[in-house]
């Protein structure tokens, strides 16, 4: 229903300007339901939250007379005593009473509410209004024609301005209404029942304008336009001509507009303070109408009652709420929105002007945008002399996680150059800043991964609590027991490997290597040879043969077990080494068994060694057994998880190559099963297992809060993850880790760090991105501000002057390269070979790639060079070559190379073209086009790299073509042939395009022709011609790829679907497929895809 509140009173109404209250004074000449003749001033509270439809009475005071007019003004005195302002009542006896509404609704006695009594007028006061600008000014007008201005700065002592000149004259007539100008505080308007309207200037103390219509109709009410200073609306209560006329003081010869709709005289009127296009009127025809002052049409009408309304007002605090007092003895509070259906004929309902009020327009507005943006708008004050209100829009960068932004900037700066020194410094700083022991351990280990070559193994072992000797002699294993060092076994069997003579002599001092049994002592009853040369070697230091023989005889005589000795000797005499070994093992003489087995050959030595190792109970012998049998995995499963540091140190010392990664993974899995999470994480780090490591770290996001926000925890996690990824060179991540990158990129984007967010997303392999991640990547890419192109357009490449006829040597710098750098493709290449000078590619610093000094280019002259581009290798945290056991080949044959991994590879990274430039001629990284191959680069041999966690791929220089050497013969001095122009739509060879792709060529050719014609064709200006030529070159490069079959099946299929959509003029689908190509096949299609989109947009515009 339209009426939302009400009260049963026949009263004039005044609404509080700044509080939810309504004053009601008993109306003169009206009879309420009680037929009472008393007069009262009452205060009602406008409580719209209450379900009660009746307004609650909060204050009441009797009045000496009834009211003709009631006004409520703001506090003009500035005193807290009058915080709710003043209520002025124009009485029928010509007096004006002033009340303090705060006293009426407060705890003070109501008798104190009457604060002033103004007695000047000699007739009923029908004109009464407070100045909207200077609220201490009150204007009053009565039937005597006088207009009085009161200063109520002190309400208890009001002052009266001198009477206005001309006021009270016979021509003025009975004042029916007065109104202050809403913009100019000294301008006052009055109207009278004789049809005259007068405009007064208080500064001049006289009227400045007066006017009337041609028939001088009675004027009952007038209102100033709230927005237009010079416009005033005057209404007539003449039943024969109940019109409303809008006058402009700049031309009073005739009204600006006339409003017709009432059938009888207009009694009351008020202009909407919230929307100057709405005017509310009530008349004696029992209609209350809301007008559109711009069109003079009816917008809404209140429901009709049993009797007409005589007083209407807009509620200033809530737009669209109005009050209406009727002769039915009711005061109703209405919502103008609920009144829209009234007063419009049913058959004309659809033609009624439906216009949203201005209060529906938000004075201010704000909306969050992608990329940490906040857009806001607010109304701007209209220019002087105009009524139109303009809006201003502001774009703000909103940062809610300031600590995250600062930490991200610091972290990005630390890893921007990518050199190991800065990364080590970063890890050391993080280790010092954290208070968690686990974090200190983690960052300490990450720091070791960036140590210099040859020192990382030592650093890791030291980090685990072990100390290596200063000098490692012959790479022997230190730290093991002295028993292991005492085992010096040499193989002298005929089928054994050749060893140094010094080792042979060290093992058997009496053995000259010719005949073992010549030196074997004879039995007591056997004659002893007297030949010295047959008994001992020439370098033996014994003085006489007799002394030696005597000693040996004495030793044999002192034997405690002659039976055992005889059995051993018999076996040795006949060469039955196995029997001799078995006898020794039975007698628990393992040392003797090992010595004899070593002479008996490799098979006997290995079996005897295994028996010895199995029977030995010493803990360190388990380590020896694992090393001898190359079974380091057994150490992982047999040693207690409590000694994980010792186990990891053993793996670091002896594991080789990929074995290190596998064994560290196994040890980490065992530690995780045992509940030692920190140790497991450290082992996973050593193994280079990024996914498993980050999976464990990610649990802190849900488990660890400690008053820290999710963004801070995620920042900690991503810093460790990125450092670990940089160390391992890993770019293949699991779906859960990709989701983590997505969450982090979203947070960065929400803080306005779009460029940084894109860098993190580029870490991920674009081939396996989820649809959500692809959308986020595309959204960030489109939202980021484009880079400013500061270079001149054109296919240019900086060159340096080089001497001629140099040897084609290649220096391969051993520097850290960016494992995540995007590989940009070259669109085409020259089709002939000339002597080439190799130049390094221009490098663009990124957060994962250091800015490296350019090595000096070297000329190389090759008629048909071959490519040496290699894909990036994933490297793990591999220790350097373990120290080999002395004479290790006697234990086992080596199964792996002595180097843990290879040295720098010679990867060739072409230079990405700058914005607005065409890619220069050069080889393609992924081979999209048949290009001349790069010359073979030979890098110097690299030594053992050590416990190095990162790959160090070199950057192969790219070749450019120098001028011909001046020393060549005359034929060679001729100008070189011009470069082959790039293929275009017209010149590209499409003879070998498969049949199912022929429609693609036809569709794209048609699209190019239509777009060229739209751009002006041959008549196009220079700018448009450049665009046409660019379109032709880009499509020509695509045609070359289709012709050579050098395009992936996925990209070709999507391209075919796109062309089918173009043939059907379905540009929306075509553009959607273009977005899919952008997100999934960008590396392959980036050269021509943007051009294709531009042409499709142009074609769609032409269709429209």
Curated annotation (Swiss-Prot):
Keywords: Endoplasmic reticulum, ER-Golgi transport, Golgi apparatus, Phosphoprotein, Protein transport, Repeat, Transport, WD repeat
UniProt repeat feature WD, residue ranges: 5-45, 62-109, 120-160, 170-210, 214-257, 261-301, 304-344, 662-707
Region (Disordered): 527-562, 782-811, 851-874, 892-931, 952-994
Entry's transmembrane regions: none
Subcellular localization: Golgi apparatus; Endoplasmic reticulum
Gene Ontology cellular component list: cytosol; endoplasmic reticulum; Golgi apparatus; plasmodesma
Family: Belongs to the WD repeat SEC31 family.
PANTHER family listed in its UniProt record: SEC31-RELATED PROTEIN (PTHR13923), SECRETORY 31, ISOFORM D (PTHR13923:SF11)
Name listed for the protein in its UniProt record: Protein transport protein SEC31 homolog B
Source organism of the structure: Arabidopsis thaliana (Mouse-ear cress)
């Amino acid at each position: 229903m339209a009426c939302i509140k009400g009260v049963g009173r026949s009263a004039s109404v005044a609404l509080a300007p700044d509080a939810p209250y309504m004053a009601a004074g008993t109306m003169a000449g009206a009879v309420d339901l009680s037929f009472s003749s008393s007069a009262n001033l009452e205060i009602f509270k406008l409580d719209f939250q209450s379900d009660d439809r009746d307004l609650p009475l909060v204050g009441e005071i009797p009045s000496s007379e009834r009211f003709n007019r009631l006004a409520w003004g703001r506090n003009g005195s500035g005193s807290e005593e009058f915080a709710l302002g003043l209520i002025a009542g124009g009485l029928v006896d010509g007096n004006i009473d002033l009340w303090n509404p705060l006293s009426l609704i407060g705890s003070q006695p109501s008798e104190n509410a009457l604060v002033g009594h103004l007695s000047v007028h000699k007739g009923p006061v029908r004109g009464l209004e407070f100045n909207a600008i200077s609220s201490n000014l009150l204007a009053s007008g009565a039937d005597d024609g006088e207009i009085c201005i009161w200063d109520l700065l002190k309400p208890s002592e009001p002052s009266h301005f001198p009477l206005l000149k001309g006021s009270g004259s016979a021509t003025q007539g009975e004042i029916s209404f007065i109104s202050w100008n809403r913009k100019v505080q000294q301008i006052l308007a009055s109207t009278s029942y004789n049809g005259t309207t007068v405009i007064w200037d208080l500064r001049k103390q006289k009227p400045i304008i007066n006017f009337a219509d041609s028939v001088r109709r009675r004027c009952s009410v007038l209102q100033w336009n709230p927005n237009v200073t010079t416009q005033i609306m005057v209404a007539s209560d003449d039943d024969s001509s109940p019109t409303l006329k809008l006058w402009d003081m700049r031309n009073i010869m005739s009204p600006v507009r006339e409003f017709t709709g009432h059938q009888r005289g207009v009694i009351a009127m008020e202009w909407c303070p919230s929307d100057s296009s709405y005017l509310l009127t009530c008349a004696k025809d029992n209609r209350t109408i809301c007008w559109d002052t711009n069109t003079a049409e009816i917008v809404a009408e209140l429901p009709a009652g049993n009797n007409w309304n005589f007083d209407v007002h807009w509620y200033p605090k809530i737009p669209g709420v109005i009050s209406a007092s009727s002769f039915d003895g009711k005061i109703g509070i209405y919502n103008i929105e609920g009144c829209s259906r009234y007063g419009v004929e049913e058959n004309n309902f659809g033609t009624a002007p439906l216009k949203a009020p201005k209060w529906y327009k938000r004075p201010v507005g704000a909306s969050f945008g992608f990329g940490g943006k906040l857009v806001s708008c607010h109304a701007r004050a209209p220019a002087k002399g105009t009524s139109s209100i303009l809006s201003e829009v502001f774009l703000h960068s909103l940062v809610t996680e300031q600590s995250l932004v600062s930490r991200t900037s610091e972290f990005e700066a630390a890893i921007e150059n990518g050199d190991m020194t800065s990364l080590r410094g970063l890890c050391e700083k993080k280790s010092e800043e954290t208070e968690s022991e686990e974090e200190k351990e983690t960052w300490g280990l990450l720091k070791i991964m960036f140590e210099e070559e040859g020192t990382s193994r030592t650093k890791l072992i030291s980090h685990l609590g072990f100390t290596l000797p200063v000098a490692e002699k012959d790479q022997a294993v230190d730290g093991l027991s002295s028993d292991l060092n005492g085992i010096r076994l040499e193989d002298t069997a005929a089928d054994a490997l050749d060893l140094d003579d010094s080792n042979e002599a060290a093992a058997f001092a009496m053995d000259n290597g010719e005949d073992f049994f010549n030196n074997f002592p004879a039995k007591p009853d056997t004659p002893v040879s007297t030949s010295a040369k047959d008994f001992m070697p020439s370098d033996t230091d014994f003085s006489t043969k007799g002394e030696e023989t005597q000693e040996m005889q004495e030793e044999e005589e002192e034997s405690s077990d002659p039976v055992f000795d005889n059995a051993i000797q018999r076996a040795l005499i006949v060469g039955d080494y196995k029997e001799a070994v078995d006898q020794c093992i039975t007698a628990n003489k393992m040392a003797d068994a090992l010595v004899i087995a070593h002479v008996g050959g490799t098979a006997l030595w290995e079996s005897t060694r295994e028996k010895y190792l199995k029977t030995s109970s010493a803990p360190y012998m388990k380590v020896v057994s694992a090393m001898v049998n190359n079974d380091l995995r057994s150490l992982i499963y047999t040693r207690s998880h409590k000694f994980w540091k010792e186990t990891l140190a053993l793996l670091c010392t002896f594991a080789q190559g990929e074995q290190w990664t596998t064994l560290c993974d196994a040890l980490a899995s065992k530690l995780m099963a045992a509940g030692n999470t920190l140790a497991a994480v450290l082992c996973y780090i050593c193994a280079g297992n990024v996914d498993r490591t980050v999976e464990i770290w990610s649990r802190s996001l849900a488990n660890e809060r400690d008053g820290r926000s999710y963004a801070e925890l995620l920042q900690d996690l991503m810093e460790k993850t990125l450092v670990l990824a940089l160390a391992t060179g890993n770019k293949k991540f699991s779906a859960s880790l990709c989701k983590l990158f997505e969450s982090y990129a979203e947070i960065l984007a929400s803080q306005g760090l779009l460029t940084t967010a894109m860098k993190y997303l580029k870490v991920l392999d674009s081939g396996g991105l989820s649809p959500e991640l692809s959308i986020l990547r595309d959204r960030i890419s489109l939202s980021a501000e484009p880079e400013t192109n500061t270079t001149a357009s054109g296919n240019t490449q900086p060159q340096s002057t080089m001497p001629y006829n140099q040897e084609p040597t290649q220096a391969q710098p051993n520097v850290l390269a960016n494992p995540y750098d995007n590989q940009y493709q070259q669109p085409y290449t020259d089709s002939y070979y000339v002597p080439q000078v190799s130049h390094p590619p221009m490098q663009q610093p990124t957060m994962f790639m250091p800015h490296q000094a350019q090595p000096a280019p070297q000329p190389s002259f090759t008629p048909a060079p071959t490519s040496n581009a290699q894909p990036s290798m994933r490297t793990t945290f591999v220790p350097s070559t373990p120290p080999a056991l002395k004479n290790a080949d006697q234990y086992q044959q080596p199964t792996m190379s002595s180097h843990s991994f290879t040295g720098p590879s010679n990867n060739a990274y072409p230079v990405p073209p700058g914005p607005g430039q065409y890619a220069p001629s050069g080889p393609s990284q992924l081979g999209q086009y048949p290009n001349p191959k790069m010359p073979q680069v030979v890098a110097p041999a690299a030594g053992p790299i050590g416990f190095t966690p990162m790959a160090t791929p070199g950057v192969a220089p790219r070749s450019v073509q120098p001028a011909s050497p001046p020393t060549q013969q005359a034929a060679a001095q001729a100008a070189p042939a011009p470069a082959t122009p790039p293929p275009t739509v017209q010149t590209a060879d499409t003879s070998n395009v498969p049949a199912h792709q022929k429609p693609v060529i036809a569709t794209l050719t048609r699209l190019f022709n239509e777009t060229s014609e739209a751009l002006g064709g041959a008549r196009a200006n220079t700018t448009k011609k450049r665009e046409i030529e660019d379109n032709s070159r880009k499509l020509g490069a695509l045609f070359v790829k289709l012709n050579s079959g050098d395009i992936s099946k996925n990209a070709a299929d999507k391209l075919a679907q796109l062309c089918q959509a173009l043939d059907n003029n379905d540009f929306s689908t075509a553009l959607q497929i273009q977005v899919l190509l952008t997100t999934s096949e960008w590396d392959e299609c980036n050269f021509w895809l943007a051009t294709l989109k531009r042409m499709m947009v142009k074609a769609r515009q032409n269709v429209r």
